[in-house]
A protein has these predicted regions:
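Serine-esterase "nucleophile elbow" of acetyl-processing enzymes
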Residues: 4-60, 66-71, 83-88, 94, ...
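Alpha-helical cap/lid subdomain in secreted, periplasmic
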Residues: 12, 74-221
């Protein structure tokens, strides 16, 4: 009997929570219907990892890192993160892909501000262990790719000056994560933002990210 219990524990499914914004939710550049599960990058990640893993999607359009949104409301990632972690425990890994919505005019924050904000999310995750529900998960931060040309985008009016800031984020966030012992992968190394709206991704980019993140996950777990 003890042998079979040990075998079951050895084959335990690994649970992964993907916490992000509209690009995790599956918002298409043409503002059409949401991408299906198989197209969205967490779904691609699930397919790449296989049956030994369970990938949970928590993407919310408009979600930012730590800010109360005075226009849309309900988009503060820090307020939502720990309740979501607890609701999905036990968790082995949390993947955070946020920062793009922080570039909105209404927040007026810099790439360094965003890096510190992501640091707060990581700290909250690392402190989320519960005596009954489970231990705190490992954390992987994904830096969002730079925005594309916004001149003809429906989002141009709320992202004034965001293109240049978004191009700076990978280096600033990378330095911050290295200094604070946080795992980070630059999604911009494999993903190109669509020229259609300058913010969201075509299906092929979701596929590229899912494949790349699978390699990161396997190295961690």
């Amino acid at each position: 009997m003890k042998f079979f219990i040990w075998l079951d524990l050895g084959m335990k499914q690994k649970n992964i929570l993907c916490f992000g914004d509209s690009n995790t939710w599956g918002f298409p550049p043409d503002c059409g219907a949401r991408y299906d599960r198989q197209t969205r990058w967490p779904g691609v990640l699930q397919a790449q990892l296989g049956e030994g893993y369970y990938v949970i999607e928590e993407g919310l359009p408009g979600r930012n890192t730590v800010w109360d949104d005075p226009v849309e409301g309900g988009k503060n990632g820090l307020e939502q993160l720990v309740p979501l972690i607890l609701s999905h425990m036990p968790l082995d890994l949390l993947i955070i892909l946020l920062g793009t919505n922080d570039f909105k005019n209404r927040f007026s924050v810099s790439p360094l501000d965003i890096s510190w904000s992501i640091g707060r999310l990581v700290k909250a995750a690392r402190d989320s262990g519960h005596p009954i529900l489970g231990e705190a998960p490992e954390v992987l931060v994904l830096c969002p790719p730079p925005l594309a040309d916004l001149s003809n985008s429906p989002f141009a009016g709320i992202l004034v000056g965001a293109e240049e800031k978004s191009r700076q984020l990978a280096s600033v966030l990378g330095a911050f994560c290295e200094e604070n012992n946080i795992r980070m992968f630059d999604a911009g190394s494999v993903v190109q933002t669509s020229q259609v709206d300058g913010v969201h991704w075509e299906p092929e980019e979701h596929r590229k990210l899912g494949v790349a993140v699978a390699a990161q996950v396997q190295a961690i777990l």
